[in-house]
Amino acid sequence: MEPRAGDGCFLGDVGFWVERTPVHEAAQRGESLQLQQLIDSGACVNQVTVDSITPLHAASLQGQAQCVQLLLAAGAQVDARNIDGSTPLCDACASGSIECVKLLLSYGAKVNPPLYTASPLHEACMSGSSECVRLLIDVGANLEAHDCHFGTPLHVACAREHLDCVKVLLNAGANVNAAKLHETALHHAAKVKNVDLIEMLIEFGGNIYARDNRGKKPSDYTWSSSAPAKCFEYYEKTPLSLSQLCRVSLRKATGVRGLEKVAKLNIPPRLIDYLSYN
């Protein structure tokens, strides 16, 4: 028999959810009053579906902050993993809910869970929530966490064209030339044909001559005479100035949280603005 929506079943990549509990349903829908009644009556807040989805996963993925709070207060496992290895913090970041992210972190959620797939920071970059990205970095998220499918968070942000997230990552000290199969963030920017993104990456020191596993430079993924192609052509003919190269070198030397270090330098405000890419 085919699963039906009314049965609480969901056909997915791995299989399908069956017999989702009333706690799962209330958490996902944001029905906080019903959820509280279920908790008060002794319902288990850590019961999982066949895909190892807990009610906390369900609430986090939908950005249901009030339900997340109720579940955590009732003893929900903050770092429970589903069948894909994702934690509720990963799901909260995927939803872009800063409220859920803050709640989970306040209950001790790991910002860098040992995963081979997307980390919370990857998920925040996918959703395009620069606010979540900034918060995760502030509490110690690994800027170079490597996802076996996507690469680093910077790769993800560039592939999804989330420029605000890209700038937050770069200002925090993310490696602009980090590679996955020799493919850099600049290759992604070229593929999505985003001139603003291309310029930003180059200004932060992106290598326009980097070659991927096919032996292609970023410019090889642009069409002749297109705006992205002309952008690469300009930077090939007009390399970064000495002042720009000095900025790249200094920011690289300051490492993670470089922006904070730059702001404390005893130099003129105009230089601080320049080094901060303002």
UniProtKB/Swiss-Prot annotation:
Entries under SMART domains matching the protein? ANK, SOCS_box
Kindly state a single biological-process term from the GO annotations of this entry: intracellular signal transduction
Name all SOCS box domain ranges.
Answer: 229-278
Q: Enumerate the ANK repeat regions by residue range.
A: 18-47, 51-80, 84-113, 116-145, 149-178, 181-210
Q: Which UniProt keywords apply?
A: ANK repeat, Repeat, Ubl conjugation pathway
Biological pathway: Protein modification; protein ubiquitination
Per the entry, what this protein does is:
May be a substrate-recognition component of a SCF-like ECS (Elongin-Cullin-SOCS-box protein) E3 ubiquitin-protein ligase complex which mediates the ubiquitination and subsequent proteasomal degradation of target proteins.
The entry sums up its family as follows:
Belongs to the ankyrin SOCS box (ASB) family.
- Give the comment on domains: The SOCS box domain mediates the interaction with the Elongin BC complex, an adapter module in different E3 ubiquitin-protein ligase complexes.
Protein name as it appears in the record: Ankyrin repeat and SOCS box protein 13
Tell me the organism: Mus musculus (Mouse)
Q: Which gene encodes it?
A: Asb13
